[in-house]
């Protein structure tokens, strides 16, 4: 069986392979948990090198149903979902016990990253994200969702 390559790459990481010291050891990517900022920056640089992308959008996740459309790397927006049509822009979601959702519509060129916590899920974060994607040209029949 040959799998057709997708033009959108969806990546999940684990906590191994980075430089953060305990209790954040070792591949912590969150800059909001008390880890050494230099370690987080080094881990993020390592991720960028591994996947070959340098432009990221990291969210300030607040357990809301807020969806933000982005078109360039930026300081973390206060949101729980980011959507873009910009090629080469990586959208990042951080989770511990929440569900990360990575969405794409290859034909429309729309991607999204969603932080689906209990409150956001109850308040339709996924539905709001899909609506936002559709407002940018995405169609339900060509959308792909990967749950982490």
PLM region descriptions:
Residues 1-11:
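N-terminal basic/disordered segments at the start of proteins
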Residues 6, 55, 141:
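Residue-level signal for beta-strand positions within conserved beta-sheet cores that form or flank
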Residues 10-46:
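Intrinsically disordered, low-complexity, positively charged segments
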Residues 13, 84, 129:
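Ser/Thr-centric signal marking residues that sit
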Residues 14-16, 62, 86, 148:
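Structured loops at beta-to-helix junctions and adjacent beta-edge loops in soluble globular domains
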Residues 22-27, 69-71, 124:
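Short, glycine/acidic-enriched capping/hinge loops at junctions between secondary-structure elements
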Residues 37, 41-117:
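Phosphate-centric recognition/catalysis
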Residues 90, 98, 105-148:
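Surface-exposed, charge/polar-rich loops and edge strands
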């Amino acid at each position: 069986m040959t799998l057709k390559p997708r033009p959108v790459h969806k990546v999940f990481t684990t906590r191994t392979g980075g430089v953060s010291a305990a209790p954040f050891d070792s591949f912590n990517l969150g800059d909001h948990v008390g880890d050494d900022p230099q370690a987080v920056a080094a881990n993020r640089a390592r991720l960028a090198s591994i996947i070959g992308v340098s432009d990221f959008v990291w969210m300030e996740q607040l357990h809301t149903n807020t969806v933000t459309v982005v078109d360039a790397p930026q300081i973390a927006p206060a949101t729980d979902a980011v959507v873009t049509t910009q090629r080469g822009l990586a959208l990042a979601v951080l989770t511990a016990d929440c569900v990360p959702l990575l969405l794409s519509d290859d034909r429309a060129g729309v991607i999204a990253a969603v932080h689906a916590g209990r409150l956001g899920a109850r308040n339709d974060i996924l539905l709001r994200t899909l609506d936002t994607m559709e407002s940018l040209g995405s169609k339900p029949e060509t959308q792909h969702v990967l749950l982490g």
